[in-house]
Amino acid sequence: PYNIMELPSYPSTARNRIFISEVLRSYLPKNGTVLETASGTGEHITFFCEEFPKLIWQPSDKSDELFFAIRKRVEAADNVKKPIVVDLLAESFGPIKEDYFGVVNINMIHIAPWEACIGLFQMAEKVITAKGIVYLYGPFKQGGKHTSESNKNFDLSLRAQNTSWGVRNLEDVQRVAETFGFYHVFTHEMPANNKSIIFKKN
């Protein structure tokens, strides 16, 4: 019953997805399965499945609230699996059975409790194959300091909405990653004071 134009949409996706796919191209294999966490409206995975047609994409989110939008957007794609519930704050992460080469997480860890970042790497340790990657995108502090005035203001607005949210410190994220067997490979500077962070499994 849904028209594509009527589906929920985030304008930032259209702005960043091309830049994100350019970074991912350097790290993703030709074949394999990639899990996207916090898929939201499915706008990123809709773009990625066309950009990387030989990869299988698995969308997921903490609830099935927006699955109707994901299903509608990818209904013509043959390389996107049905969306699954993956709650990074839960002790078990839902119906994740197979080995994934990578986990892609875009614009989540600053609008979720810190425990969701821990849960992300805890899950990744269990489901990612050897030498697989975790890709994070979003704003980050470095050395405990904001990299721009706009990020500082954004952080304040996030914390005003929810005290458990906020722009994360990159070094803190790296420590969590290392705890679960991932090392920091590279940080790519992105438009609008965002970063692409690549972690690889030991």
Report residues per predicted region.
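Core SAM-dependent methyltransferase catalytic element
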Residues: 182-202
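A short acidic, Gly/Pro-enriched loop at the edge of an enzyme's catalytic core
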Residues: 94-103
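Conserved S-adenosyl-L-methionine
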Residues: 38
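A short, conserved alpha-helix within the catalytic core of class I
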Residues: 111-124
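Class I SAM-dependent methyltransferase Rossmann-like catalytic core
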Residues: 4-30
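Conserved Class I S-adenosyl-L-methionine
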Residues: 147-171
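Conserved beta-strand signature within the Rossmann-like core of class I S-adenosyl-L-methionine
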Residues: 131-140
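Class I SAM-dependent methyltransferase SAM/SAH-binding core
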Residues: 35, 43-93
